Structure formats: structure tokens, C-alpha cells
Amino acid sequence: MKQILFMDTTLRDGEQSPGVNLNEQEKLQIARQLERLGINVMEAGFAAASEGDFQSVKRIANTIQNATVMSLARAKESDIRRAYEAVKGAVSPRLHVFLATSDIHMKYKLCMSKEDVLDSIHRSVTLGKSLFPTVQFSAEDATRTSRAFLAEAVEVAIRAGANVINIPDTVGYTNPEEYYSLFKYLQESVPSYEKAIFSCHCHDDLGMAVANSLAAVEGGALQVEGTINGIGERAGNAALEEVAVALHIRKDFYEAESSMTLKEIKATSTLVSRLTGMVVPKNKAIVGANAFAHESGIHQDGVLKEVTTYEIIEPSLIGESQNLFVLGKHSGRHAFTEKMKELGYEFTKEERDVVFEAFKNLADRKKEITEEDLRALMLGEAAFAAQQYSITQLQVHFVSNSTQCATVVLKDEEGNMYEDAATGSGSIEAIYNAIQRILGLECDLADYRIQSITQGQDALAHVHVELKEGTHQVSGFGVAQDVLEASARAYVHAAGKLKSFITLVK
């Protein structure tokens, strides 16, 4: 049984999804959950892209203990050295250097000859190997590259010291049979093939990213790259949770396994969805809301008689809870702390006191507190704690068929209070206008979405907003039992990010 490594690029490729804008604290939250999931390698970002990216990569590298942390870099000395400075503090640092090898990229993007590309690969990998214990080389647009030249480029990279060779389907162009044969071709055509681990990286432009990844495993790939929920540029990447469960359920066919902690899949998917604002489709495989639902009477009858008639995956395998009541208003601090530890959360005493107070406030208003509620509570409190501004008071004057008025009081990190009021055609517009007046912002609301965390009239609300000012767009979220409060929290979260960006560029 061969062991498959999983390389997660949610924090780099996934964050390139249109409208996704994660701050440092949010990236760290995801990185910690990826560690709990058992991801072998996480691409923390592109350190040379900006100072913000550099700091995020560095913080993740200095925090994660049980996974390799990697930074992307172009085949440029400045990028490689910047990546080294960012991840050198990691327990297991890695460089990911890439260069395009297809004719179309070499001609129109790079303006380089094949000889120039081979020389650049050699120089960049050699430099990387002098700094990093492991180096991964990616031949960008590999599936549209001449196979003979691809084999030549891969051989140069391995001889220069590359430990991992990635064969990406950058534009989602290939199909399973073709991708399988490409890995087999490289196995036969690259003299130093056995000296490196071969990896696959598939995009979903033609809807075959997961199928192509599994075909690569059949063809000899020992590392699979992708993102949680399959997020990413254009149509996204291979969904790692789908690949992992497919390998587990069909061990008989693939004869492969991974070290992924499958019961953490649902929690990871939910966290990524809520922080990025990218909703998981209900019919998505593995983690969609309908993944274990049966509407057909024939199917329901079969499942009631014998669950395996129509269910090949047990919900508990991926950590899908039945949303049972776990805590209530009579639960004490110790029970709360132990339950949160069970869910993977650790606190300082000060953090525990703040979160426990938020829990008790929720328990006073909500009869039953589920695991989903606790995760949402943690997510909301973590976001709130990292904000420049917090809401201390929110008052809305509602009159049917009339202009609405809202009064908002915000507190900044130094404890200064700011109050203003505004009107709007609806309660939410009035709240948002008041917040804009306080923060001195002029921006457009590009998106507003609301989602119920659990069922019932007393369920928590999760609101996602996207704000746009010029060409810059940011997202924010808020969690509360009251929809207006959740909406206000989401707006303050996003507005704080936007205000920081505007201050930075000025």
C-alpha cells in the first residue's frame, strides 16, 4: 500500500479565488486547522508578493509544528531568498519554485528559448537547494508542454537538487487517461526519476480535477496538491477532501492511503467556507449539505433497511455530526473547556474567559448549543478579537414603509468610543451608512449573504459581506443570533480591512 502525501494550497492558490481576501489571523486559523487535518505540506503563500504575504507566511512557518511549510517563488533569486527568510523558522521548511515549460508560455509570457528555460531551472533549483532542505520544482503548464522537453526540464531540476517534481495541469486542460500516461511517460523517460517524489496539481476548468488527480496516483504520483472545497482561480482546484475520501473508500482499487485525519474534514471545510465567504454547494461531494440526504422513497426505504444500500460513506468518517445538543446554559466552565479541547481549540485563561462569556450569553438565548454553534462562536469571537473596531451598541428605529434610522457605537483598540447615526431605505442600509460615517469610508457593498448555522428559529446567523473601493475588494463576516447584529459585525470586519488597506497605500 503506497503512502500518498497531501499538499494543501488553500492559503495560496485558494486565496486567489475572486473576492477572497484573508488577513493574517484568518490564514493562521486555517493553517492550524490544516495541521489538525493531517496535511503533510501546506503552501502558506507567495512570500515575495507583498509585505503582508511575507508576514503571513513567516507567522505560519513559525507556528506549525507537524507539517512542512512551503512558500511559492518564481525562478528568480530575489523571490527565492525572500521565501527563505519567510519559512526558515519552520520545523520543516520547503521552497516551491516554478517556471513555465509550454511553448505558448515560453513564447508569449517568458520570451525565453528552451535553452534559457533549462538554464533558469538549473540556477534557481541549485540556489534553492543551497538554502532549503527540500525543494519542489513545478513545470507550469506541464500538460501543454512537449513531452520530450518536459522530461528534459524535469531531469535538469532533479540533477540540480529538486526533491519533489510537480506536473501541474495549470489550465485544467488534460483528462484522466492522458494525465495517467504523462506520468508513466516521465517514469520511463527521466533517468533520475527515482530520486524525486512526483506530484500532481490539477485545476477544474473542464470539471476533471479530482479524476485527474486520482489518475495521477494510478500513474505513480506520490503527492497530490489541491485545496479545501476545491476553491481557487477560475473553476478552482482539485478538492483534497474528495481525493482523500476516494482513496480511503477505494483502497481496493488505488492501493494507496494517506495520513489525513478524515474526521476533521467537515470542520476544515466549514472553516474555509466561512472565512473565505465561498459557500459550499449543497450537492457537493463529501461536504455538501445534501451529501448524505435521501429524497427518493426507494432510496429512503433501502437506507432504513440497510444503510450501505445507498450510502458508501458513513457521515461520521468525515466528522459530520448529527448536530446533537452538546452544551446548555447550565454547563460550567470546565465542561465548556473540555468540549472545546475535544473540538481542537486551546485557550489562554484570558481567551477562555472571553469565549466562555460569549457562550453563556448565547446559552441564555438559545435552548440547545450544538458543535456547529460552538465552531461558529469561536470563529466569530476570533474575528472580533482581531478587529480594529468592535460594536458596543447598535440601535435601530424601525417604522413600516418608512425610512429607517440606525445608531451605532464603535470602540477602537485604544478604547476610544465613536457614535453616529444614519438613515437608509432599510435597517441594514441604515446600519451600514452609520458605520461608514464613523470610519470615514466611501465604498460600495459588492455582496451580502446570510446563512443559518443550524436549524430552528433561535439559530445563529452567519453574514458575509464584500466591500469595494475602486479596484480593491475585501470581505468580512459576522456571527450572531440577531441578523442585524451579525450584519453589523460583518460590515465592521470588512470595513476595518478596507480602512487598513487605504491607510497603507496612502
From Swiss-Prot:
- Is Cytoplasm among the key words of this record? yes
Q: What class of enzyme is it?
A: transferase
List the Gene3D superfamilies hit by this protein, alphabetically. Answer: 1.10.238.260, 3.30.160.270, Aldolase class I (3.20.20.70)
Q: Which InterPro entries match?
A: 2-IPM_HCS-like (IPR050073), 2-isopropylmalate_synth_dimer (IPR013709), AIPM/Hcit_synth_CS (IPR002034), Aldolase_TIM (IPR013785), LeuA/HCS_post-cat (IPR054691), LeuA_allosteric_dom_sf (IPR036230), LeuA_bact_synth (IPR005671), PYR_CT (IPR000891)
Could you say which EC number(s) this protein's record lists? 2.3.3.13
List the pathway annotation. Amino-acid biosynthesis; L-leucine biosynthesis; L-leucine from 3-methyl-2-oxobutanoate: step 1/4
What CDD domains does the database record attribute to this sequence? Answer: DRE_TIM_IPMS (cd07940)
The UniProt entry, under SUPFAM superfamilies, shows: 2-isopropylmalate synthase LeuA, allosteric (dimerisation) domain, Aldolase
Tell me its cofactors. Answer: Mn(2+)
Residues reported to bind Mn(2+): 13, 201, 203, 237
Provide a Gene Ontology MF annotation, just one: acetyl-CoA C-acetyltransferase activity
Q: Where in the cell is it found?
A: Cytoplasm
A GO cellular component annotation here is: cytoplasm
Report keywords, A-Z: Amino-acid biosynthesis, Branched-chain amino acid biosynthesis, Cytoplasm, Leucine biosynthesis, Manganese, Metal-binding, Transferase
Assembly with partners or alone: Homodimer.
Role description:
Catalyzes the condensation of the acetyl group of acetyl-CoA with 3-methyl-2-oxobutanoate (2-ketoisovalerate) to form 3-carboxy-3-hydroxy-4-methylpentanoate (2-isopropylmalate).
Show the HAMAP family listed in the entry. LeuA_type1
The molecule here is called 2-isopropylmalate synthase
Q: What is the lineage of its organism?
A: Bacteria, Bacillati, Bacillota, Bacilli, Bacillales
